[in-house]
Amino acid sequence: IGGVAAFDPEEGGVVSPGGVGFDINCGVRLLASHLTLEDLLPRQKELADALYRLVPSGVGSERRDVRFSKRELKEILKEGAGWLVKRGYGYPEDVRFIESEGRLPWANPDKVSERAFERGAPQIGTLGSGNHFLEVQYVDEVYDEEAALAFGLFKGQVTVLIHTGSRGLGHQV
């Protein structure tokens, strides 16, 4: 999966040669928290330390605290985000914000190579490397109140911008 996006230069456009990554579901998501900047500032070092400790990232990053068997990986590939939610790795209300609710009904994990399973198993729940990142931000200014309300955003709100994808498993597929 990859793509080039070109926009009309007469309209101030640009060419983006890598607007979409080549691992499945590579992309950027915005997590809107219930916290405000005032809530966060006194605890920012504590938050940064926790993120470094709890979110494995970088080349070769793996989860050591969570491991899935091949059978479980096949179930994840078939049932999608719902499988993870049922086991406490997410919130039911979040599934409705994922494309196709995080599941493709026609997915067939039997078509996935052994190499993809080997690469993917230790990487589930990791951020990755390269241009993947996790960035804690806050809403500094709201320019369109109606749009902000629709997205559940408000001035001073802490958000987390996450760029990740399916890593080795998705790359192999």
Predicted regions and their residues:
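Glycine-rich, flexible loop motifs
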Residues: G3, F7-E10, V14-G19, I24-L149, ...
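A conserved active-site cap/scaffold subdomain adjacent to cofactor or substrate pockets
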Residues: K155-V173
